[in-house]
Amino acid sequence: MPAITCVWSDGRSDTWPNVNGHSRTRSVPSLKPLPHQDSKNLLYRQICGRLLAQHVFGGAGSTQPILNQLCKRLSTGNPNNTNASTVVTAPEKNVVSARHVRPNPKSSKDTLEKQPKYSSQIYLTDSFENYYLASLPTNYQLYQRDSNRENGNGKREFWLYGHPSGRPFRSVNDFLHHLYWLISDLTRNESTCCCVLCSGNMTRVRKNLQKENERMFHECKDDTYTWPSSYRLGEVVWIDINNELIPAIIVARNLINYESNQMDAVKLISDTFVEPYQYHCKQLGNSRYYFDMAAADIEPWSRHPLDLQKQEHLVAHSICQTWNLFGIFQPLEGIDMEEPKFHDENYSIPLTVLPTFGGESNSLDDHFYGIFRGAEKLWINDLCVISTSSLPSVLQKTSFMYISDIYVNEDDIVCFQGSLWTQIDKNALDYNDSADNIDEHKDDLKELPRRLQMVSKLSNTYFRCLHDKSVEYVCPFADVLGRWYEPWFVKGDLNYTSEVKERTSSRLSAVGSENWVDDDFYEYLLSEIDMVSAVVM
């Protein structure tokens, strides 16, 4: 069974109860420590591990099960060898879309019949059942508490001692919030923990804040690591409705999968797993219309020119003139941690620190989870295209930056920090080049985000870091041109622009009268779509 290890603890052994010579009476319950090997201790840790895995590797709409299934397929070398045990199949539903695939009109009838059809196969968290906590955090001890059963009102409980307050956690659910804080919040700031012992009468407020921060954590992980979506929540895009391109904004998405022709192995991998989302889009300039779209019917905003004679284009253009930062967090500097990753049995996830509580700060050197830049949304651990005009000659071949940090420096300038990479078409290399550089390419591939490993496997492309891996470059916000897209998502050239003029407090304030966020909308959305992920603004 895959184990989750808690590498840091705030536990104190001096808070444990003294049970030497202690016996149960009518008024005093008995306390018995349960050692690590005890079956009840293991059961307690299994419950903790299962719930914790849903927080760390799961999340509403998470694509982690899809990633697990694809890795199993690739490892066996047989893409058609599907492990269906992690998939819960729901009744098929049609996706409202102008068209999912643009078939060649010269294609035969047999070819067209092989085009994929969407269904609503929902991936749930069944795969988390086998997780367990390798051991309780250091200096935490589980006790079995038996109250007097002679009058028939007694009961058996399991209390966990070790919290600095000296009070015990009286249930697994109470301890889970503290355990999640121990593992995920590397700031070690107890004011951010929402367990009953740390937060006191602020428990409800902190839990609501944690819920929002956790949703942002999973959205970032899904967008940049687990299995990236083509488009992000809150982005302005073009949608194809009856062969007409209409400006729209993505307000929600839900996880889907569809059954394809099992004989077409390459197509099965690239279609089924590259784009696991359906997008819920709101037409800009007309608040009455929402569309459920497949990724093939959506294009990046930088793909087509504007017609400023049309009102809806003007509305979209005004939003794309704005930018805003969101999700303040504490960097890992100074944190004593050997390897900042969550570990699965077969995979490891980059450990992105949860955002700190509170709104936007006015202090300098703030670090941010992400940024809305014009039409697009960028995260840390993301890929962006930058202007090479200010780079030295040895870096002129830069194709994109792998973002490790977004922060405001002492001059109040937004900066992007990360490594610079180039992409090389394998067909463009001569025989000697490809032979000499193959080992270097393999080393670089290990350091890439999973999405680029996938691109390299499914296309004739190498990715290579242009500098020493211990060095990172800082790029000012003005030199960032936009997101880097996988080659199969872009149907032509992108017209990048660096023209963003107005800073706003949030995406909703930039949207203005086009705001769609209200209780009625999400109540309708949740009733219509399974496993929906609402926009984080």
Curated annotation (Swiss-Prot):
Out of the domains of life, which is the source?
Eukaryota
UniProt KW keywords? Centromere, Chromatin regulator, Chromosome, Nucleus, Repressor, Telomere, Transcription, Transcription regulation
Query: What Pfam families does the database record attribute to this sequence?
Result: Clr2, Clr2_transil
Function as written in the Swiss-Prot or TrEMBL entry: Required for deacetylation in the mating-type region and the centromere. Acts upstream of the histone deacetylases to promote transcriptional silencing. Required for proper positioning of nucleosomes at heterochromatic loci and for transcriptional gene silencing (TGS) function of the Snf2/Hdac-containing repressor complex (SHREC).
- Note the InterPro entries from the entry: Clr2 (IPR038986), Clr2_N (IPR031915), Tscrpt-silencing_Clr2_C (IPR018839)
Native organism? Schizosaccharomyces pombe (strain 972 / ATCC 24843) (Fission yeast)
Instruction: Return the Basic and acidic residues bias intervals.
Output: 107-116
Q: Which GO terms describe its biological process?
A: chromatin organization; pericentric heterochromatin formation; rDNA heterochromatin formation; silent mating-type cassette heterochromatin formation; subtelomeric heterochromatin formation
- Transmembrane stretches, start-end: none
- The primary site where this protein sits is nucleus
Q: Which gene encodes it?
A: clr2
Subunit: Interacts with clr3.
Q: Where in the cell is it found?
A: Nucleus; Chromosome, Centromere; Chromosome, Telomere
Signal peptide (UniProt feature, chain positions): none
GO CC entries: CENP-A containing chromatin; mating-type region heterochromatin; pericentric heterochromatin; rDNA heterochromatin; SHREC complex; subtelomeric heterochromatin
Q: Where is this region: Disordered?
A: 96-116
Full protein name: Cryptic loci regulator 2
